[in-house]
Regions:
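Short, acidic/small-residue loops that bind anionic groups at enzyme active sites
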Residues: 44-66, 73-79, 207-211
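C-terminal active-site/capping subdomain that shapes the small-molecule cofactor and substrate pocket
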Residues: 164-214
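Conserved anion/nucleotide-ligand pocket segment
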Residues: 72-135
């Protein structure tokens, strides 16, 4: 099926891991879809007493937002299903973050970068999930934040629509910076979009002075 179990089963398994003081980190096995169906009901009262790293990306963005609203950090990074496809540098970065060796940041030399200096809380995740979470109670606070986005297997015009939504709703104007992660396997629709994904994103933030990193 689409999910690894029923909503009840998945909720109770995750809640048990959040509550367990002996658990130091929770690695979500894979992305896809389904976290939004259970994360709103999670209880973080015991998690606050024994916080732990939560690791994942894509669909796990909704869980990251819940952790953020509980006042804690989490790690947007590779999951076990993808470990065999992830480069060593990224895995080393994940290890460094988990064990406090470094902040895990990687350098970028993209020609699309908009150079500058900024400060802010790093928030974000999968663009499609962020778009779907607009106005939910556990949506991120974007004021003076550095937003990080990534996505997979989307049409270019979908990326444009989501970025324009974030612009129209004031999210992009409130940021202090934007980091664009991997935008993999982007597709063209029946009417091909003439711009690259990077150009679509830069067009959405062209009115703002903050730096953009690809």
């Amino acid at each position: 099926g689409v999910f690894a179990g029923t909503d009840s089963q998945r909720f109770h398994d995750l809640q048990e891991a959040l509550n367990n003081p002996e658990v130091r980190a929770i690695f979500c096995a894979r992305g896809g879809y389904g976290s939004i169906r259970i994360v709103g009901d999670l209880d973080f009262s015991q998690f606050i007493q024994s916080p732990k790293w939560i690791v994942g990306f894509s669909d796990i963005t909704a869980l990251h937002a819940r952790v953020y609203n509980a006042g804690f950090m989490s790690i947007h990074a590779a999951m076990p299903k993808n470990f065999d496809k992830v480069d060593v540098e990224s895995l080393d970065s994940l290890y460094a973050m988990l064990f406090g060796i470094s902040n895990g940041l990687l350098e970028s030399n993209s020609v699309y970068n908009k150079i500058g200096n900024t400060r802010g809380t790093l928030v974000g995740g999968n663009l499609s999930v962020l778009y779907s979470m607009r106005a939910v109670p556990f949506e991120y606070s974007y004021a003076n934040a550095i937003l990080c986005i990534e996505d997979l297997n989307e049409y270019r015009y979908h990326i444009d629509r989501m970025m324009q939504n974030l612009k129209a709703s004031g999210v992009l104007a409130s940021l202090s910076g934007l980091v664009v992660g991997e935008m993999l396997d982007m597709k063209q629709g029946a009417d091909p979009h003439k711009y690259e994904v990077e150009e679509i994103i830069l067009d959405a933030v062209k009115d703002y002075s903050y730096p953009v990193c690809f």
